[in-house]
């Protein structure tokens, strides 16, 4: 959780200026106090995410429903809004089940074109929405046959945009996913849409500088000269991924590490720390 309004806005890819005044009035600390005062104890995870101690979303739903019904609000579901009309400083909300008159409306549109058009008719200028929080479609020999392989911490760069994000990473059937990918897709949502989701990324699977990785490899080579490269546990990656790295580098996993050439070592380092891959599209996560 973050309790400083200005710092909090820095975590939002868009709308930080507009959110500052909102967070000055009501921020995560207020939200936590609101729930805990209504008998929903909360906990802060290591990554700063906040969850109910119960680990059940029903705890949150129950608290909010009880509060709304206690204040005599009505909750109407399965009702589709067909039109909103400005009427004498009020809003007439038209539905098939009847009309509602309101002085204030909060409309959570999502990306539904129909909803956006209704808001636009009320005089609001709409900015064309683009997808955010998506995964990358990639076809690369290094990822082939490895869906489900995860990395505790990796770094993804988009060199052409001079941007990077780090965090857990997951190989999927269609490419790459996980927090590192989702974060960079959120921050660069508009630019990636302009690129039609065709761009190059550079991945550091072990999230340490290539010079440090080189030192670790050379030290291991000196200390374990007779060990086969395929059985050498040097970095925090799975055995399957390590052997896939050797495969794309055309290195026999049975080869003694003492016999690994400088060229082969460099190929391993490039695959681990500076792997370039072409993104060819996006998918939902």
Model regions and ranges:
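Residue-level recognition of phosphate/Mg2+-coordinating polar/acidic sites
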Residues: 3-7, 13, 24, 30-48, ...
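N-terminal Rossmann-like dinucleotide/flavin-binding domain of flavoprotein oxidoreductases
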Residues: 8-14, 18-43, 54-74
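Glycine-rich phosphate-binding loop signature in dinucleotide/nucleotide-binding domains
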Residues: 71-76, 98-101, 277
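A conserved short coil-to-beta-strand element within the FAD-binding core of flavoproteins
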Residues: 75-91
């Amino acid at each position: 959780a973050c309790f400083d309004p200005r710092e909090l806005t820095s975590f939002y890819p868009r709308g930080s200026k507009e959110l500052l005044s909102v967070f000055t009035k009501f921020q995560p600390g207020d939200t936590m106090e609101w729930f805990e005062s209504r008998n929903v104890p909360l906990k802060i995870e290591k990554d700063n995410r906040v969850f109910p101690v119960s680990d059940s979303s029903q705890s949150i739903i129950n608290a909010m429903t009880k509060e709304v019904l206690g204040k005599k609000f009505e909750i109407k579901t399965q009702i589709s809004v067909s039109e909103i009309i400005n009427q004498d400083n009020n809003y007439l909300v038209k539905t098939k089940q009847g009309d509602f008159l309101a002085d204030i409306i909060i409309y959570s549109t999502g990306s539904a074109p129909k909803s956006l058009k209704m808001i636009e008719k009320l005089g609001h200028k709409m900015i064309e929405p683009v997808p955010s929080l998506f995964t990358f479609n990639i076809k690369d020999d290094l990822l082939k046959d490895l869906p489900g392989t995860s990395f505790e911490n990796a770094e993804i760069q988009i060199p052409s945009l001079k941007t990077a994000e780090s965090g857990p990473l997951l190989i999927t059937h269609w490419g790459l996913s996980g927090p590192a990918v989702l974060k960079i897709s959120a921050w660069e949502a508009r630019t990636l849409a302009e690129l039609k989701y065709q761009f190059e990324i550079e991945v550091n699977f072990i999230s340490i500088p290539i010079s440090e990785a080189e030192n670790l490899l050379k030290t291991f080579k000196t200390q374990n000269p007779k060990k086969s490269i395929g059985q050498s546990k040097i970095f925090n990656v799975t055995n399957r991924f390590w052997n896939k790295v050797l495969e794309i580098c055309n290195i026999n996993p049975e080869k003694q590490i003492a016999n690994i050439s400088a060229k082969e070592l460099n190929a391993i380092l490039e695959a681990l720390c500076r792997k370039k891959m072409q993104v060819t599209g996006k998918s939902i996560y």
